[in-house]
Amino acid sequence: MIKEEREFFDVAAKPWRDVPQSKCAGLRERILSGDPATGNYSRILCFDPGTDTTPNGVLTHDFWEEVYIVEGSIVDLRLGREFRAGQYACRPPGMPHGPWKSPGGCTTFEVRYTKD
């Protein structure tokens, strides 16, 4: 199966859900498109104000991940750096990142995909 073909649609019509694999409260996502067979998907990720992802630990993935911060900011607790709206990351498989804290909240647009 591949991602569904979609022309523009109202993103607000997609429901928010808690991030299933997260061990902490305050992370919600809207899946915009996805392919369950490959795990490739695009989503909007929301950190509620005060969210701390320390329970999730440092993350690494076996897929590529691109992240654009739409609004707000997050602090990488491992690096001790704050990243703000307008900044972008491209993470290859295996790149460690997080945990994160977002004192004022943050919204990101993310694309995850395998190399092949």
Which ranges hold each PLM region?
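A short, N-terminal "cap"/entry segment at the start of jelly-roll beta-barrel domains
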Residues: 1-41
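Ligand-binding loop in jelly-roll beta-barrel domains
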Residues: 27, 93-116
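Conserved short histidine dyad/triad with adjacent acidic residue
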Residues: 30-61, 80, 92-96
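Short, well-ordered beta-strand segments in beta-rich or mixed alpha/beta enzyme
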Residues: 45-47, 68-74, 107-109
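Glycine- and acidic-residue-biased ligand/ion/polar-headgroup-sensing regions
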Residues: 55-77
